[in-house]
Structure formats: structure tokens, C-alpha cells
């Protein structure tokens, strides 16, 4: 599953590594690993919840950054030592920073991701192999000494085995907003988030969905410690993932609160922990309670 804040300190370390590499115009690297879990209370199909291990490697030189990652996701029954339908996801991204200064920054990312699905106890399904292409500009604009406007916009194209995986062939995703820095310790970010899956092919209607949220973060920096309480407030959400049985859209209302903690050892090593709870209401069926937790480690050199 996709999460915008998981292990933010690790992402920050990667960004710092890129900035340092640009200043020195030499190579800088970082490697890391994460283990994430997701669970909907009382939902038997996800067994004990989704397990999501991942590893990554980034290399930066001047305005260039190359990122490699490998991720898995699937339901796990820990007591029985088995898992349900799962997929693995190798990924390559290349980012180029066209402009970077205190007043304005602009970069562009291109990426390729492969989804390898392995179906368990699903009649008529064995494996599926789907690809995703990505292009994503990002920006940061200084409005005042304390106020900045920043964000990113990703455009995706999916191909192969879409009728099996249930994905739409096109997707856009963006998160953008304002950040106000009160002092070296406290800042506030308020963003608008949109993710929309749709089909450019008029003959298809599978996997279409829309999510709109307000996302607010309160980053606190206390020496080597970073703490970020955050929330996601649902504005509009619908899906038709079960298009084979019911082509009508189903409405949802999801609202989340979470807390991220990171620690930088000041020797290249950093670690992070995160937990989030989400209330999920649906037009069809009962409401759900969702839990997310993640732990990560990163080393920069």
C-alpha cells in the first residue's frame, strides 16, 4: 500500500544526502530497509494483516539521483507460517534537479516499477505481471522567509494483465500545500492530496477510484530527535474495485491520525518508527478500524 509519510526521517536522510552530493559534486549513497504492517480489525481475508518488507539503495551526484527499491506486500498468518496472495515490486527511479536555490527549486523524476503477483487459493488465477511507468515533477517556492509552497505531481501508466490485477490503466497522484516554519524546532504543513485511477481506454472500467484528503503535519525537531504528529481528513472518496460484480461506485469516508518518530545518530545511521489509526466508513457494509505500523533503518555514506 502507498503511504506518504512512512519513515519520513529516512526520506529526509536521502534528501540531505542528495543536497550534500550536489554541493560537493561527488557521489553520496544511502541504503535502508523498512518493515510495515497494516491490519483492518476483524477482516479475515487479510489474515493477521498485510506484511510489507522493503529495501532500497540511493545514489546521488550533483543534480542526479538514482533510486532502487524492492518491496513485497501480502496477507500473513504468522501462527500458521503461511501467506495469501502477494506481490513483489522492484523499482527504478531517476531524478534530475533542474534548479535549486532558496527562492525556487524544481526537479523531475522518471520511474519504472514491475508488479509480480502470486495468487494463492484463487481459482483461475496463478500469476500476473504488470508494469507501471511514472513521470513526476516536484517544486518548492519561497513565499516569505517563513512560508513556502511545495509539492509533487505523479502521472502513472499501467500495462499488462490489468484485467487480472484489477488496476485501471492510468493514475494521477499529487500532494501539495504550504509549510510555515515557526522556528528551528516547530513547523506546520497543510497539504491537499489527490489520487485518481481511471481508464484512457473507453472499453474498460476496472479499478477506477478517487481519493481527496487534507493532510496536516506538525514536524518537531529536538536535537537528534524528530517527532511528527499528523492527520488525514477525508474530503471525497469512492471506488469500484469490484467492477466484475458491481460497476456502481462505492463511497467511503476515511480519517487518520498518526505519529512518526525518527532518531539520527549523527554517524550516517538513522532509525524511525511510525503508527497510525484510521476510521473507515463505507456506503456499503460495516465501518472498519485500520492500523498501520512501520519501522525503518537508513545508513548514509
Curated annotation (Swiss-Prot):
Top-level taxon in the UniProt lineage: Bacteria
This protein's record includes keyword Mitochondrion: no
Subcellular compartments: Cell outer membrane
Cited InterPro entries: Bact_OM_Channel_sf, Outer_membrane_porin_G
Any Pfam family matching the protein: Porin_OmpG
Signal sequence residues: 1-21
Predominant location: membrane
GO terms under cellular component: cell outer membrane; pore complex
Assembly and interaction partners: Monomer.
Protein purpose: Forms channels functionally larger than those of classical porins. May act as a regulator of the RCS-phosphorelay signal transduction pathway.
Name by which UniProt lists this protein: Outer membrane porin G
Gene source species: Escherichia coli (strain K12)
Amino acid at each position: 500500500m502507498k503511504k506518504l509519510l512512512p519513515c519520513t526521517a529516512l526520506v529526509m536522510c536521502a534528501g540531505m544526502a542528495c543536497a550534500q552530493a550536489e554541493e560537493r559534486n561527488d557521489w553520496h549513497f544511502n541504503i535502508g530497509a523498512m518493515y510495515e504492517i497494516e491490519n483492518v480489525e476483524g477482516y479475515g481475508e487479510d489474515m493477521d494483516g498485510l506484511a510489507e518488507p522493503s529495501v532500497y539503495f540511493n545514489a546521488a551526484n550533483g543534480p542526479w539521483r538514482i533510486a532502487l527499491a524492492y518491496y513485497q506486500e501480502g496477507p500473513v498468518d504468522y501462527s500458521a507460517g503461511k501467506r495469501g496472495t502477494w506481490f513483489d515490486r522492484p523499482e527504478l527511479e531517476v531524478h534530475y534537479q533542474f534548479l535549486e536555490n532558496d527562492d525556487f527549486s524544481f526537479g523531475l523524476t522518471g520511474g519504472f516499477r514491475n508488479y509480480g503477483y502470486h495468487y494463492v487459493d484463487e481459482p483461475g488465477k496463478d500469476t500476473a505481471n504488470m508494469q507501471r511507468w511514472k513521470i513526476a515533477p516536484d517544486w518548492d517556492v519561497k513565499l516569505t522567509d517563513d512560508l513556502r509552497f511545495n509539492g509533487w505531481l505523479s502521472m502513472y501508466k499501467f500495462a499488462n494483465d490489468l484485467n487480472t490485477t484489477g488496476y485501471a490503466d492510468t493514475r494521477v497522484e499529487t500532494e501539495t500545500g504550504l509549510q510555515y516554519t515557526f522556528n528551528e524546532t516547530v513547523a506546520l504543513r497543510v497539504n491537499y492530496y489527490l489520487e485518481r485511477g481511471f481508464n484512457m481506454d473507453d472499453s474498460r472500467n476496472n479499478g477506477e477510484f478517487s481519493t481527496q484528503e487534507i493532510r496536516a503535519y506538525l514536524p518537531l525537531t529536538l536535537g537528534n530527535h524528530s517527532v511528527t504528529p499528523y492527520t488525514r481528513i477525508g474530503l471525497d472518496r469512492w471506488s469500484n474495485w469490484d467492477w466484475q460484480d458491481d460497476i456502481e461506485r462505492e463511497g467511503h469516508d476515511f480519517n487518520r491520525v498518526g505519529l512518526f518518530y525518527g532518531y539520527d545518530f549523527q554517524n550516517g545511521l538513522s532509525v524511525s518508527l511510525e503508527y497510525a489509526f484510521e476510521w473507515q466508513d463505507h456506503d456499503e457494509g460495516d465501518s472498519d478500524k485500520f492500523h498501520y505500523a512501520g519501522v525503518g533503518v537508513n545508513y548514509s555514506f
